[in-house]
Amino acid sequence: MYQKILIRYGELTLKGQNKRDFINDLKRNLMFHIPKEQIKMEYDRAFLDFSLTNLDALKYVFGISSYSCVYEVESSLAAITSKVLDIAKQKYPFKTFAIAARRHNKNFEMNSNDLNRHLGCAILSNFEVKVNLEEPDLKIYVEVRDASTYIFIDYIAGLGGMPLNSAGQVLHLMSGGIDSPVAAYLLQKRGLRINFLNFITPPHTDEKTTQKVDELIKVIAKYQGSAKLYQVNFTDIMNYIGLVSNQKYKIILMRRSFYRIAQMLAKKLHIKALSNGENLAQVASQTLEAIHTVSAPITLPIFRPLLSFDKNETIKIAEKIGTMPISILKACETCELFAPKNPIIKPTPEEASELEKELDKLPELEKLAVENVTIKTISTL
């Protein structure tokens, strides 16, 4: 029976003076899922008490390069040799093997090379097998540390990236499509905690549509324990923008309004960046000119992690993280309801600003939308 789960840190091993802060962020992330007393953080490794529950939890923790289920023995040559032979006995028959021993404890009686030879000879003396350092049937890893030695036979890939919260927070414009949940996941991987903003247009968007967004956020929230969803009633603004003289600009003006509202809300919440699931030139509103025009009134950075992705790349991630089955459910999206037959492909900020002069009540309506935002906490714990 395994005693521990050994965790290897991801990029945070490169972070110099800030490394302790990143390790503390990782510990807090682990504590979303695992009791504090079962976690031990060290400078280059973390250790968890072994359980299937703890093992499963690591699927939702960023900042981990890899992890292994390990046997823990005292750091003595006799104890290490005994456990290595025990593992070999459990795995036999096998034709070839290799030993990969590392001595972190410099006071240990053998160096790494001598320990490799000693353990290899012990197996050769007890089993009819051969050494194969390139592609062995069985490879046994040994890490000799100060208090204990950890022995294991495989590496499990972690999510990589940076620990959640290590990069701050972002306000993410969330829809029920395929792209925006995947974009949120990728931002989490870079250490950002996600706050979600969703625009609804009752009675056009029904309960089924809002439930779909809630379910998508539940999937993404697994990686951060819980998430705040800010919901804005956009019906009055949508109808008002619909009065503009150049109907081809409706989607552009709507998206500019989205971002002005998002920026006002973000500043109110002391959040320093916005984000979305936009992809360059995927649809009419995502040409370079459209993105430039929509972003023109905004001073906060707007993160677009999917900007250069092929749709198939995005779908692959959506399937992997479990959002795809929810995203493809039929629902009424605000953008779809409002789209003109022939949207403009190459808008300009100047033309958009001129058209907004026709809508003199727009700033007041946007301010009102922020004041009346509804807040929902979505938790998966």
From Swiss-Prot:
It is found in: Cytoplasm. CDD domains: PPase_ThiI, THUMP_ThiI. Residues 52-155 form the THUMP domain. ATP binds at residues 173-174, 198-199, 255, 277, 286. GO terms for molecular function: ATP binding; CCA tRNA nucleotidyltransferase activity; tRNA binding; tRNA-uracil-4 sulfurtransferase activity. InterPro entries: Rossmann-like_a/b/a_fold (IPR014729), ThiI_AANH (IPR020536), ThiI_fer (IPR054173), ThiI_N (IPR049961), THUMP_dom (IPR004114), THUMP_ThiI (IPR049962), tRNA_STrfase (IPR003720), tRNA_sulfurtransferase_ThiI (IPR050102). It is an enzyme of class 2 (transferase). Belongs to the ThiI family. Catalyzes the ATP-dependent transfer of a sulfur to tRNA to produce 4-thiouridine in position 8 of tRNAs, which functions as a near-UV photosensor. Also catalyzes the transfer of sulfur to the sulfur carrier protein ThiS, forming ThiS-thiocarboxylate. This is a step in the synthesis of thiazole, in the thiamine biosynthesis pathway. The sulfur is donated as persulfide by IscS. This is Probable tRNA sulfurtransferase.
